[in-house]
Swiss-Prot record:
Organism: Brucella canis (strain ATCC 23365 / NCTC 10854 / RM-666)
Topology class, membrane: Multi-pass membrane protein
Name by which UniProt lists this protein: Heme A synthase
Pathway: Porphyrin-containing compound metabolism; heme A biosynthesis; heme A from heme O: step 1/1
Keyword line: Cell membrane, Heme biosynthesis, Iron, Membrane, Metal-binding, Oxidoreductase, Transmembrane, Transmembrane helix
Cofactors that this protein relies on: heme b
UniProt entry tagged with the keyword Cell cycle: no
GO CC, alphabetical: plasma membrane
Compartments reported by the entry: Cell membrane
Biological process annotations from GO: heme A biosynthetic process
Catalytic reactions of this protein: Fe(II)-heme o + 2 A + H2O = Fe(II)-heme a + 2 AH2
Amino acid sequence: MAATSAQHIGLQGHGTSRNDRDRRLVRYWLYAVFAVLIAIVMVGGATRMTGSGLSITEWKPIHGVIPPLNHAEWVEEFEKYQQIPQYQQINKGMSLAEFQYIFWWEWAHRLLARFVGFLVAVPLGFFWLTGRLKGGLKYRMLGLLALGGLQGAIGWWMVASGLSELTSVSQYRLAIHLTTACVIITAVFYIARGLVTYSERPAERSIQRFAGWIVFAVLVQIYLGGLVAGLHAGLTYNTWPLMDGAIIPSDLFTQAPWWRNLFENPKTVQFVHRMFAYTVLLLAILHAVQVWKNAPGTTHARRTIVLVGLVFIQAMIGIATLLMSAPLHLGLTHQFFALVVLAFAVAHWRATKGAYAA
């Protein structure tokens, strides 16, 4: 039975002690990947908020690791940036030192992205060749590696949208890039938490499903947040709880066809992001009520209280960010806490499914 269960989760079953060691090693590896992914998203957020995302105008997956090393190379890189609309229309007259500041943000973001590829690929090869992975887990890891490669391509696709006509990247592509990163984070953390031994029985199926829907709702809200960021929609209505003195502002559907407002009208995008934040909080509360009714006093129930608290704190951070017109420190705090909420929701969802047998 133990060997069957071990194979079910994709770990080589050579007895409990070997299996436990392998499980622990793989879990710690995935935690390291998870931590670097969080760092990538946060540096990416800082890159966006400092207007640095278009500072590197070429995609060089290998040679791009090496930054300019002397004055002549810096001037050459700066001249490339001077050819794009963002410089010509917004940053004209920028000094070389100012360019270097935005360059380093984008370079660090890309360097971390390359590093996480090695952090996945090299240990994956080691675990695979030494028999520490088997079956499904192997292919899940290969899937993550492929998804990471796709994310790199999405990142360049996003940057390319701001190099010819726009002065910033497309909000559509920015939101997709951010959401894909969070899907990868979700998958990595879900698999890692699946390698933990839980002491409590799995929750009933309805609880598991609701927990999964909350993860999905958080991902949707992150996507909406990406649209807000891409359109600078956080600078439209800087009051709360009303927007322009109304619960529902009058200028939400000024573009035709109407659905374009949901993606291209900054006021509408902020409105939807606000309303969905309330929806996520309501879902978390309803889930807590469900679990306390059906599994009172359990660890599952206690986790739902923490989840509600985290969602509430994130809402308060969002309100503060809005009222202060999205300063860098609050914008990054809001983004980081979104990842905290997502990670806890994923951990809770995985835990409701119970322990993998050793």
